[in-house]
């Protein structure tokens, strides 16, 4: 669990406001967790005329219990017991692919705890990314390696690099998953940083390893992995420029369905440029992971509210366009888990599993690493059903 500790513990200190963050550590996007927000924000603009209004938010008991029951099932000891990230995409065969970043594999004790990770005296496996496939209400874990020695589906190039997952799409029968590569450059707690963006392509029948990995634009400090949306002949890719406080949305697009096409970037004047350097800050207040979804005739941005310090609030903005402006902040939900050492982060939608409205997930975590051993329920996604009017 060394990487999990080194990544989370320094961020926890910084987010709690106990110390200044070294400039080098924040030079590019860190692990997707909420950050100290801006101290002042301008008044919210009116909601877009074509954007829906949030009507009600309720717990999605089916999905929340699906992952709870699966995580507690000890019928296999090389499968999922908790993770964050929680993106999803519908596979061509109709199955649902759940995409995770940091992942615990192994068993759950009868008291609801998990053994420490391998290397800390236990047998819990810790990977930086994994998949789970849902079919007919049943889940199965996808990893590479073997049952005795699981490895990540998106393998690191060496022990000083690793990948965290972003949103995904399907093109030409293959699953295209965005990943952010991080690197360790020293021995100190702060000595790691974002390095680049890539897209990995997976065959639906062989999800344990990519068939190809291609570099994505990475030259200007934007993590192009926050959200993906197909709309009107384009595939829009949403990124975050994470300065700690604030975080800025950026928007790019590719003609057609594949992220391997030619990218163009939204400029400040609303036109598009082939140069990533022209990419404009669309708005602040987004998290590292968020979503943009078409609902009715408008577009809904779902995000944790990073205009507040360690906010438990999930909010929505609306637009008449997939690239904004997104206005009219609406409260969606206040996460009840947020208290003490526990925080929530990175809410986003799963439109392919929604019925009447949107399904939203969010992640739960703790600033105290041993909490993840003590209580397996902490490090698991929660799901919500949101209806609009």
Model-derived regions: residue spans:
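Secretory targeting and sorting signals
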Residues: 1-29
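C-terminal region of N-terminal signal peptides and the immediate post-cleavage residues
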Residues: 18-47
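Beta-rich carbohydrate-recognition and catalytic domains
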Residues: 41-78, 91-161, 170-219, 239-284, ...
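Beta-propeller and closely related beta-sheet repeat lectin domains
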Residues: 84-87, 149-169, 224-227, 288-291, ...
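Long, low-complexity, proline- and polar/charged-enriched segments
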Residues: 223-231, 239-241
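Short, ordered beta-strand-loop transition motifs
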Residues: 229-232, 296, 353
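Short aromatic loop motif centered on NTY/YTY
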Residues: 339-368
């Amino acid at each position: 669990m060394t990487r999990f500790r080194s990544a989370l513990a320094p961020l926890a200190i910084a987010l709690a406001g106990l110390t200044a963050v070294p400039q080098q550590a924040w030079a590019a996007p860190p692990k997707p967790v909420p950050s100290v927000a801006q101290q002042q924000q301008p008044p919210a603009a009116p909601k877009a005329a074509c954007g829906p209004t949030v009507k009600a938010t309720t717990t999605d008991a089916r999905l929340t219990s699906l992952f709870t029951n699966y995580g507690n099932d000890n019928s296999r000891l090389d499968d999922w017991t908790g993770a964050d990230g929680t993106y999803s995409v519908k596979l061509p065969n109709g199955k649902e692919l759940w995409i995770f970043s940091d992942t615990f594999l192994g068993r759950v004790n009868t008291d609801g705890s998990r053994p420490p990770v391998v290397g800390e005296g236990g047998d819990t496996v810790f990977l930086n990314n994994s998949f789970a496939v849902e079919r007919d209400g049943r889940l199965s874990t996808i990893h590479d390696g073997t049952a005795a020695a699981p490895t990540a589906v998106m393998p690191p190039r060496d022990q000083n690099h690793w990948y965290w997952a972003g949103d995904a799409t399907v093109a030409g029968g293959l699953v295209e998953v965005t990943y952010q590569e991080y690197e360790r450059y020293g021995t100190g707690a702060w000595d790691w940083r974002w390095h680049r963006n890539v897209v990995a392509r997976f065959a639906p029948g062989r999800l344990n390893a990519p068939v190809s990995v291609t570099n994505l634009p990475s030259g200007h400090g934007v993590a192009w992995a926050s959200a993906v949306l197909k709309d009107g002949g384009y595939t829009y890719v949403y990124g975050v420029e994470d300065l700690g406080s604030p975080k800025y949305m950026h928007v790019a697009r590719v003609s057609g369905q594949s992220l391997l096409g030619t990218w163009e970037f939204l400029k400040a004047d609303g036109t598009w440029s082939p140069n990533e350097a022209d990419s404009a800050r669309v708005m602040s207040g987004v998290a590292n992971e968020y979503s943009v979804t078409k609902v009715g005739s408008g577009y809904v941005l779902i995000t944790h509210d990073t205009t507040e310090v360690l906010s438990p609030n999930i909010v929505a903005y609306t637009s008449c366009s997939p690239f904004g402006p997104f206005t009219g902040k609406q409260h969606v939900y206040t996460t009840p888990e947020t208290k003490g050492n526990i925080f929530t982060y990175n809410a986003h939608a799963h439109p392919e599993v929604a019925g009447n409205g949107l399904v939203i997930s969010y992640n739960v975590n703790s600033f105290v690493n041993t909490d993840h051993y003590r209580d397996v329920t902490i490090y698991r996604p929660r799901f919500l059903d949101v209806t609009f009017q």
